[in-house]
Amino acid sequence: MKRKEIIDDVTMKRAITRITYEIIERNKNLDNIVLAGIKTRGVFLAKRIQERLKQLENLDIPVGELDTKPFRDDMKVEVDTTTMPVDITDKDIILIDDVLYTGRTIRAAIDNLVSLGRPSRVSLAVLIDRGHRELPIRADYVGKNIPTSQFEEILVEVMEHDGYDRVSIIDPS
């Protein structure tokens, strides 16, 4: 198994900052935004974007934590650990995840969202888009596009969970 670091902590911070600026530029009413981090690492990324929005725009944007496992078609988990601090009805939701791959996690996240309320709009921000979609889903905000083979894996590590800020490609061969 080979591991190659492709994004370090500085590059990751820049990508998150770029996503934050794009969110500011594309959303006329920032007061209507709710960030929804997809567990696990998407939550930490959402909190970082929330912090940058506070620094740049002096806004306190709510952050929810979406558990997609009960909504996936490839596993069955009974307990839903989703937390959403506000009613999402008529809100502009920005889903945040670490890696966009097949699109199945995002589909499950959207199913979870609509079980909570009826947002006016849902968009998607991801740190890494690696391609290989199985569903017609695309990200609105992308930190980095990193094409991979289907055999490779992308490993995102964040300081809050893993002790490092980095992204690596794992080649199992």
UniProtKB/Swiss-Prot annotation:
Whether Signal counts among this entry's keywords is no
Q: Which InterPro entries match?
A: PRibTrfase_dom (IPR000836), PRTase-like (IPR029057), PyrR (IPR023050), PyrR_bifunctional (IPR050137)
Q: Which domain of life is it from?
A: Bacteria
Please name the Pfam families in this protein's record: Pribosyltran (PF00156)
- The answer on whether this UniProt entry bears the keyword Thylakoid reads no
Q: What is its EC number?
A: 2.4.2.9
According to the record's subunit comment, the protein's assembly and interactions are:
Homodimer and homohexamer; in equilibrium.
Protein name from the UniProt record: Bifunctional protein PyrR
Native source species:
Streptococcus agalactiae serotype V (strain ATCC BAA-611 / 2603 V/R)
